Curated annotation (Swiss-Prot):
This is Large ribosomal subunit protein bL32. The lineage of its organism: Bacteria, Thermotogati, Deinococcota, Deinococci, Thermales. GO terms for cellular component: large ribosomal subunit. It comes from Thermus thermophilus (strain ATCC BAA-163 / DSM 7039 / HB27). The gene is rpmF. InterPro entries: Ribosomal_bL32 (IPR002677), Ribosomal_bL32_bact (IPR044957), Ribosomal_zn-bd (IPR011332). Gene3D superfamilies: Single helix bin. Keywords: Ribonucleoprotein, Ribosomal protein. Belongs to the bacterial ribosomal protein bL32 family. SUPFAM superfamilies: Zn-binding ribosomal proteins (SSF57829). PANTHER family: 50S RIBOSOMAL PROTEIN L32, LARGE RIBOSOMAL SUBUNIT PROTEIN BL32. Residues 1-23 have a biased composition (Basic residues). Part of the 50S ribosomal subunit. It holds the Pfam family Ribosomal_L32p. GO terms for biological process: translation.
């Protein structure tokens, strides 16, 4: 039976938590559409009304 490598020392809570410090999720950034006030990602066509930069660019 083959032996596999195991940790020589127990990982401390501080080292474990420091490694996980970059794992947090960021909430999506949403802005209100100037035409219909629906929340949408910035710099994108509004999925509700189809407007972008004050012009109708998508038929909804």
């Amino acid at each position: 039976m083959a032996k596999h490598p195991v940790p020589k020392k127990k990982t401390s809570k501080a080292r474990r938590d420091a490694r996980r410090s970059h794992h947090a999720l960021t909430p999506p950034i949403l802005v209100p559409c100037p035409e219909c006030k629906a929340m949408k990602p910035p710099h994108t066509v509004c999925p509700e009304c189809g407007y972008y930069a004050g012009r109708k660019v998508l038929e909804v």
